[in-house]
Amino acid sequence: MQTVSDAFDAAYWQARYATPGRAGWDAGRTTPPLRAYFDQLPVAQQPRILIPGAGRAYEAEYLHRLGFRHVVVADLAPEPLAELAARVPDFPKENLWHVDFFALHHREQFDLIIEQTFFCAIDPSLRPAYARQCAALLRPGGKLVGVLFDTAFAGASEPPFGGSREEYRAYFAPYFQFIHFDTAHNSLAPRAGRELFICLQKPAASPAA
């Protein structure tokens, strides 16, 4: 089983979250591309949603306040999960998973996986495994939706790691149909023109099914 890189393990992330200024990609709120997507989701359908590597999980908080009741937050580090529990006391505790995303069993099936700064936080060598695991955890017809950095961070030896849309397309193409895969039009100002908004759908018959 391929798991999170030893270099960026639970202790590494716990230390980063505990050190002021070392989670520089943390926007402090749900970013506009995802907020716009969440606002048009039908609450009545109550999809099962996974947010892996969620960090402080502003997206989970936003979805919870919209009325979504089956949002699962997964993270290697306990600190951000505890922060979410304190910030949103009525968020279901059983949906706060202190776990390695790559170790999640495929019997866990979701309708939607949200990507927000997890892909850029894993060792780039794990990106093919990330795409494969997302597909395995989605029901047929399920979607992977989120934002990816469409820029390189020169000399990066630790997260965040950048990349290009051509690189990303190669990872996801074996498992997903591309509904949307283009520059986000409503990014935060510091990220404008440097983010891709993606909406990828697992086909009814998938190699990761």
Model-derived features with residue positions:
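Class I (Rossmann-like) S-adenosyl-L-methionine-dependent methyltransferase catalytic domain
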Residues: 1-51, 55-108, 122-209
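A conserved beta-strand element that flanks and buttresses the S-adenosyl-L-methionine
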Residues: 114
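Short catalytic micro-motifs in class I SAM-dependent methyltransferases
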Residues: 117-121
